[in-house]
């Protein structure tokens, strides 16, 4: 088991694991400190470097989203099972989810690039993995992350977004993101929602 905020098992042991469970018990520490309602609990099951199950509990909204890499997904809201929304309201704007506290110059440059392609862009500042939940539900369209983050910040969201018809791409290689690596740092990436993928 790999958890944020605790020491990792040494890599020469972890690299032999077929499965690893990656947990972030408090994703969005600043959101928690400022009590703005945008912190989450993330959990992902990784098989041979690929996330196969993801769950995000958006605590203050009383919302739990879960998905399997096979595409099966679900949502629980305030203790009741609900239909997983798969398309937000239609918008002529490209809705880009960015970090409320950690937006980088490269992410702003990416937004400028989208504008240079002729898109009208609406920035949606959000905290923690609530960005990934909104992307999976179709409430935003793109989520770039070019600043530092760890595997436990990304893995669960990747499963949700891809199960909902979106795509996640490693911005350095154009390929997929691998998990349970030696340093556990995620590469820069872009998550695309179903509407734009």
Residue ranges: model-predicted function:
Residues 1-26, 109-112, 133, 173-175:
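N-terminal subdomain of lithium-sensitive/metallo-dependent phosphomonoesterases centered on the IMPase/IPPase/PAP
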Residues 10-14, 56, 85-88, 180-182:
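Short secondary-structure boundary/capping segments
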Residues 11-74:
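DPxDG-like acidic metal-binding loop motif
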Residues 28-29, 96, 135:
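Buried hydrophobic positions in well-ordered alpha/beta secondary-structure cores of metabolic enzymes
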Residues 46-50, 60, 69-72, 79-80, ...:
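Short loop segments at secondary-structure junctions
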Residues 83-107, 113-126:
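Short loop->beta-strand "edge-of-pocket" segments that line small-molecule binding or catalytic clefts
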Residues 108-117, 124, 130-197:
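Oxyanion/phosphate-interacting regions
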């Amino acid at each position: 088991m790999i958890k944020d905020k605790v020491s990792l098992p040494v890599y020469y042991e972890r690299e032999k694991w077929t499965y690893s469970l990656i947990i972030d018990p408090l994703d969005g520490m600043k959101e928690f400190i400022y009590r703005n309602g945008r912190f989450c609990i993330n959990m992902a099951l990784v098989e041979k470097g690929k996330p196969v199950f993801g769950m995000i509990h958006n605590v203050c909204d009383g919302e739990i989203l879960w998905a399997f890499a096979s595409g099966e997904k679900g949502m629980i809201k305030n203790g009741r099972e609900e239909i997983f929304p798969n398309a937000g309201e239609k918008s002529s704007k490209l809705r880009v989810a960015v970090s409320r506290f950690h937006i980088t110059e490269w992410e702003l440059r990416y937004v400028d690039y989208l504008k240079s392609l002729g898109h009208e862009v609406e920035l949606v500042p959000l905290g923690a993995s609530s960005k990934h939940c909104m992307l999976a539900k179709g409430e935003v369209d793109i989520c770039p992350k070019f600043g530092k983050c760890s595997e436990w910040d990304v893995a669960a969201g990747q499963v949700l977004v891809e199960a909902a018809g979106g795509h996640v791409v490693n911005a350095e290689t154009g390929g997929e993101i691998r998990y349970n690596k030696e340093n556990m740092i995620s590469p820069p990436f872009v998550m695309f929602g179903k509407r734009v993928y």
